[in-house]
Amino acid sequence: MIGLPANTRVWIVAGHTDMRKGFDGLAAVAQSALAANPFCGHVFVFRGRRGDILKVLWFDGQGLMLLAKRLERGRFVWPQADSGAVALSPAQLSMLLEGIDWRMPVRTHRPELAA
């Protein structure tokens, strides 16, 4: 993921979003559902109904950036709320994009090379 400025806030848009939406449609969702300005520099994260697709909308000061990710297996961990927003740290966003449960991260065993 692209490095975010230190003061950037990350917002999960709770519930599910129509993943057919692009830049303008997702910006409109951020405005209507969260009463937020999508051009303020915050990051807005949206999830589809099935839970295997995420879209991330971010205004970097020059234009809107849209990142999409689809998991080949499993679903992204998402808040139970049907509406509103949940704040994340940039580190939690990285975990979310990696498919890790950002609510309760668990250290996993990393195998070492066999000699």
What are the functions of these language-model segments?
Residues 1-115:
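Polybasic/polar functional segments that serve as interface/processing modules
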